[in-house]
Amino acid sequence: MTQKAKNTIYLLILIILSMLCLVYASVPLYSIFCKVTGYGGTVRTATATQSKLGKTTIKIRFNADINKELPWKFYPEIPYTTVKPGEQKLIFYRAENLTNEYVSGMAVYNVTPYKVGKYFNKVACFCFTKQTLSPYQKTIMPVSFFIDPNIETDPETSDVKLITLSYTFFKYKENTK
């Protein structure tokens, strides 16, 4: 085999390995990108609210879905609320385990329209950790959030009057690796 053929084979192997590494790293990298930028309706987390209050009022609608593998009831206590940007709100979802076994679930979330994700900040949320309910247990799950007042000055979001905060609960499966 000529040296040129060997170099071509080495290059192809290097390209394939690079592509495999990129595929393996793409999910966590995309997740980090979405959390940092708010892309795709990904909500940001915060430790405190803004000190300035906005002038407009925005209606927040709450949505709750459950994957068919999770035997729970899950719903918001109220269907919507209103909030001024910068104002911290505390709302509650309710969950109930419908079985006679311990069941764990994990919630994923987003907001729509997607363009407001970078302005929607969660201070506390049940979605940050796995939730385990004992047999037939009913529980209340709090969510504390605020909307960054800069939403009012961004030309892409200044006209937003309705935001939907949506959760989907999935059955938590322990990693068996």
UniProtKB/Swiss-Prot annotation:
Q: Cite the InterPro entries for this sequence.
A: CtaG/Cox11_dom_sf, Cyt_c_oxidase_assmbl_CtaG
- Periplasmic domain ranges by topology: 30-177
Can you cite an annotated GO cellular component? plasma membrane
The record, for PANTHER family, names: CYTOCHROME C OXIDASE ASSEMBLY PROTEIN COX11, MITOCHONDRIAL-RELATED, CYTOCHROME C OXIDASE ASSEMBLY PROTEIN COX11-RELATED
What membrane topology is given?
Single-pass type II membrane protein
GO annotation terms (biological process): respiratory chain complex IV assembly
Organism encoding this protein: Ehrlichia ruminantium (strain Welgevonden)
Name the predominant localization: membrane
In terms of HAMAP family, this protein maps to:
CtaG
* Keyword annotations of the record: Cell inner membrane, Cell membrane, Copper, Membrane, Signal-anchor, Transmembrane, Transmembrane helix
Q: Provide the family line.
A: Belongs to the COX11/CtaG family.
Where is the chain membrane-spanning? 9-29
Write out the GO MF terms.
Answer: copper ion binding
Q: Please state where this protein is localized.
A: Cell inner membrane
Protein name per Swiss-Prot or TrEMBL: Cytochrome c oxidase assembly protein CtaG
Q: Tell me the residue ranges located in the Cytoplasmic compartment per UniProt.
A: 1-8
